[in-house]
């Protein structure tokens, strides 16, 4: 859908307002009247831009997914066949930053799959499949060549991603558990060390203990 240039700023404002409210309240918990109020327009004007509420939801999700791609250093590590001790910290750096810098995106994806499941896979596939497919291929290669334990690469791909998204919230539900980390750099180290300890075969892990400790990649 395209709009006259003079209206594009207003449309962007509507989409931004919708993303905020849908992420906070869910799809069914958000009304177009609330979105119009937050965007400082009338509800009639909103419907001139978006005929249906669902159209606005998908526009807001696409706006948050736009530009999401693997970073250059991570892509290079994957394509060059760098070891897991190099690539996993790079992967966790991107996952942690996404969780911190794009919190609305994660909530919108959850809302899409819970409340609008019939189209969620199609929209998310367009943007997320290239990312997860590249990571999955890398993990599969390293499983095949013995650098990682023999596990299902697709399950591992899902586990790596969801651990970053879910672990901080689960920790809050465990009585007496300390905060999992103090900042994003420590978070990258925590997840990298944990998963390398879990995934690297014992004989390779012994060799890794002689190498410098895993740190977050430079910003």
Located regions from the model:
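C-terminal peripheral helix-coil segments that are non-catalytic and often amphipathic
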Residues: 1, 86, 93-97, 101, ...
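Helix-turn-helix
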Residues: 13, 21-55, 59-60
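Short hydrophobic clusters on alpha-helical segments that form packing/core surfaces
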Residues: 14-22, 95, 195
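Amphipathic alpha-helical linker/stalk segments
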Residues: 60-91, 138-143
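Short secondary-structure transition hinges
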Residues: 86, 97-134, 155, 178-181
């Amino acid at each position: 859908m395209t709009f006259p240039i003079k209206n594009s700023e207003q449309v962007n404002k509507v989409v931004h307002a919708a993303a905020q409210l849908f992420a906070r309240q869910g799809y069914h918990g958000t009304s177009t009247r609330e979105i119009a109020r937050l965007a400082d327009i009338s509800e009639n004007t909103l419907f001139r831009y978006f005929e249906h509420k669902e159209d606005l939801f998908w526009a807001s999700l696409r706006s948050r997914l736009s530009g999401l791609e693997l970073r250059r250093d991570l892509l290079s590590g994957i394509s060059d066949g760098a070891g897991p001790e190099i690539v996993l910290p790079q992967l966790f750096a991107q996952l942690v930053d996404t969780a911190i810098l794009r919190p609305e995106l994660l909530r919108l994806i959850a809302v899409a799959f819970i409340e609008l499941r019939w189209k969620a896979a199609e929209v998310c596939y367009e943007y997320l499949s290239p990312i997860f497919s590249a990571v999955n291929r890398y993990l599969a290669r390293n499983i095949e060549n013995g650098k990682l334990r023999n596990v299902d690469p697709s399950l591992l791909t899902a586990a790596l991603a969801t651990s970053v998204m879910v672990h901080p919230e689960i920790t809050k539900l465990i009585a007496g558990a300390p905060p999992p980390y103090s900042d994003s750099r420590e978070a990258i180290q925590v997840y990298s060390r944990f998963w390398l300890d879990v995934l690297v075969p014992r004989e390779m892990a012994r060799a890794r203990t002689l190498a410098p400790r895993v740190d977050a990649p430079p910003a």
